[in-house]
UniProtKB/Swiss-Prot annotation:
Keyword Protein transport attached: yes
InterPro entries assigned: LolA/LolB/LppX (IPR029046), OM_lipoprot_carrier_LolA-like (IPR004564), OM_lipoprot_carrier_LolA_Pbac (IPR018323)
CDD domains cross-referenced by the UniProt entry: LolA
Organism field: Bordetella parapertussis (strain 12822 / ATCC BAA-587 / NCTC 13253)
GO cellular component: outer membrane-bounded periplasmic space
Name the UniProt record assigns to this protein: Outer-membrane lipoprotein carrier protein
Region forming the signal peptide: 1-26
SUPFAM superfamilies listed in its UniProt record: Prokaryotic lipoproteins and lipoprotein localization factors (SSF89392)
Gene Ontology biological process terms, A to Z: lipoprotein localization to outer membrane; lipoprotein transport
Protein keywords: Chaperone, Periplasm, Protein transport, Signal, Transport
Quaternary structure note: Monomer.
UniProt xrefs under NCBIfam families: lolA, PRK00031.1-3
Protein family (similarity comment): Belongs to the LolA family.
């Protein structure tokens, strides 16, 4: 269970990475993402996340809310089926598992520098970290695929589907062949208060610095 939660936390970072707002519907997915990187500085919304193994086994569906503010700040709050909180203040990323009484702390560059989070929190030069290509339209969405140039990234590809000037779905295939699908909803672009990204570990919990 602990390994599953650690993986879920990493995938949460991946998921926040691809949140986007886009120009006119006629624009390609790549153009929409480019516009997002250049113009959308922050947003809030809701998510639902499910993971399927190569053998078809499923993990419990997660749901919750998120917020982000570039560069490098985000909050990913899992509410169901168990609580988990991931917060970045722009310098450090805190992952808090209440029932494990543990907080894991990583530097932002370590946590998102070579992950799909660079799509959201980076400077927009995706070609440096990813090989980006267009995909055929599917399920009423316009798609692009980002493959990491770093073989140690921990995932093989992330597909991003956009609709009505907003991201609708993210599909990530990790190094073990698991596919994680994140459905996004209620996306509201706009500035997010800095207080949303502040986190102090509760007294009595184990703090593990990576």
């Amino acid at each position: 269970m602990h390994m599953i939660r650690r993986a879920a936390g990493a995938l949460a970072v991946f998921a926040v990475a691809a949140l986007a707002a886009a120009p006119a519907w006629a624009a390609t997915a790549q153009e929409q993402l480019d516009t997002f990187v250049a113009t959308v500085k922050g947003a809030t919304g809701s998510f639902k996340q499910s993971t399927v193994s190569p053998q078809g086994a499923t993990q419990p569906t997660q749901s919750g809310t998120f917020a982000f503010q570039r560069p490098g700040k985000f909050k990913w709050a899992v509410q169901l089926p168990y609580e988990q909180l991931i917060v970045s203040d722009g310098k450090q990323v805190f992952q808090y598992d209440p029932d494990l009484a543990q907080v894991t702390v990583r530097q932002v560059d370590q946590a998102i520098g070579t992950s799909p989070a660079a799509i959201l929190f980076g400077a927009g030069q995706l070609g440096q970290a990813f090989a980006v290509s267009a995909l055929p339209d599917r399920d009423g969405l316009q798609w692009l695929r980002a493959k990491p140039r770093n073989a140690d990234a921990g995932f093989s590809q992330v597909d991003i589907g956009l609709r009505d000037n907003q991201p609708a779905r993210i599909e990530l295939v990790d190094a073990f062949g698991q596919t994680t699908r994140v459905e996004l909803s209620n996306l509201l672009p706009g500035a997010v208060p800095a207080s949303e990204f502040q986190f102090t570990p509760p007294q009595g919990v184990d703090v593990v610095k990576m």
